[in-house]
């Protein structure tokens, strides 16, 4: 909205579908943002993605240089933190758009934080309008094993896609 450009949620899904997941940072993984920085940082991740032609390296950036100029020479110093492009954690990115009766216009899930056995789930849905209400329900034992916890009004149009892990404790 800030730049006056329409952005369809399906476009984000299409990008994630063709972008491999190269990092598995906490809380979903065993490495931390500090480890990513020591391994070469975001530019090293971008350099890996560029090996498969996934970036428009001729685009100008706020640095006054192109993407390609910015990532030139940024090597992956730790393949345990930043997986090589030919050995990703998953072939698809960390986000996915879900659609259905609970979210007919779509909702965003952090696919990389979902354990494989939960990729398909049937059960009651507990719907909350904010994370605080969901946390309250967890702390007062209103959430039962097998309940799907849905937190509405968070994300790109809400509070900017904060981590929702507090409601899972």
Over which residues does each language-model region extend?
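Catalytic or ion-coupling anion/metal-binding cores of large enzyme and transporter domains
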Residues: 1-169
